[in-house]
UniProtKB/Swiss-Prot annotation:
Disulfide pairings: none
Stored HAMAP family: Ribosomal_uL4_A
Biological source species: Pyrococcus abyssi (strain GE5 / Orsay)
Gene Ontology annotations for the cellular component aspect, listed alphabetically: ribonucleoprotein complex; ribosome
Annotated function: One of the primary rRNA binding proteins, this protein initially binds near the 5'-end of the 23S rRNA. It is important during the early stages of 50S assembly. It makes multiple contacts with different domains of the 23S rRNA in the assembled 50S subunit and ribosome.
InterPro entries membership: Ribosomal_uL4 (IPR002136), Ribosomal_uL4_dom_sf (IPR023574), Ribosomal_uL4_euk/arc_CS (IPR013000), Ribosomal_uL4_euk/arch (IPR045240), Ribosomall_uL4-arc (IPR019970)
Subunit structure: Part of the 50S ribosomal subunit.
Protein name (record): Large ribosomal subunit protein uL4
Length: 255
């Protein structure tokens, strides 16, 4: 199947054979598992000091004193110590670094998940259901010439995105940016940001600098393409712009 290739003015200039990966069956279950596996591998193991709450000189006073038979400080006041329910005592079941906190996924399943997520970017209904505004997008998948990779100015990419019909989706991402509810706003996560278009290139020749300041826009080299880029939040069908060299590289990787 051949699709059109567009120039930076949004005009069709050529045609290209679509790789077989774009015809992979839709597997939202595998995509979800792959994204969660990617999430969990970034979690940092945490534990507690094995001696926390135990640095006390205590003794057991035994029975016959009308007091609970728990470890108590040797010196007055004879407060309870060491035990979990005492002030300054140890934790009952503290978190341990040995805990397995990551979710696994088989290599073939992860590969199939990425292929399925790539195919979802070419499905109009899936992209629309994800919330992207694609009324002015000429086709899916949207493939442009490699000249896009060399654009390094934000004002230039703004005009290009308008001509390609994806600027409306960038405006949507900008409008949805807001302050997070809860204490996360005090922990370096103040703003919630919507995901807009994804730009997949064969080689970065300056486009990262040209597109990074647009709200919701991400740029990735096709060799580093992961399922999280294509399905943020486990939701497949992200609006994606491909360059010709990225499509050729997809043919080499996935056929």
């Amino acid at each position: 199947m051949k699709v059109k290739v567009f120039d930076l003015n949004g005009q069709p200039v050529d045609e290209i054979e679509l790789p077989k990966v774009f015809f992979t069956p839709f597997r939202p279950d595998l995509i979800r598992r792959a994204v969660i596996a990617s999430w969990t591998h970034r979690i940092q193991p945490q534990g507690r000091d094995p001696m926390a709450g135990k640095r006390r000189v205590t003794e057991n006073i035994g029975k016959g004193h009308g007091m609970a038979r728990v470890e108590r400080l040797k010196t007055p006041p004879r407060y309870a110590a060491f035990v979990p329910f005492a002030r300054g005592g140890r934790r009952t079941h503290p978190p341990k670094v040995e805990k397995i906190i990551w979710e696994g996924i088989n290599k073939k399943e992860r590969r199939l998940a990425i292929m399925s997520a790539i195919a979802a970017t070419a499905n109009y209904d899936i992209v629309k259901a994800r919330g992207h505004i694609i009324d002015n997008v000429p086709q899916l998948p949207l493939i442009v010439v490699d000249d896009l990779q060399k654009v390094s100015k934000t004002r230039e990419t703004r005009e290009i995105f308008k001509k390609l019909g994806i600027w409306d989706d960038i405006e949507r991402a900008k409008e949805k940016t807001g302050i997070r509810a809860g204490k996360g706003k005090m922990r370096g996560r103040r703003y919630k940001k919507a995901k807009g278009p994804l730009i997949v290139v064969g080689k970065n020749e300056g486009i990262v600098f040209g597109a990074r300041n647009h709200p919701g826009v991400d740029v990735v080299v096709v060799d580093n393409l992961g399922v999280e880029h294509l399905a943020p939040g486990t939701h497949p069908g992200r609006l994606t712009v491909w360059t010709v060299s990225a499509i050729e590289r997809l043919k080499e990787i996935y056929g």
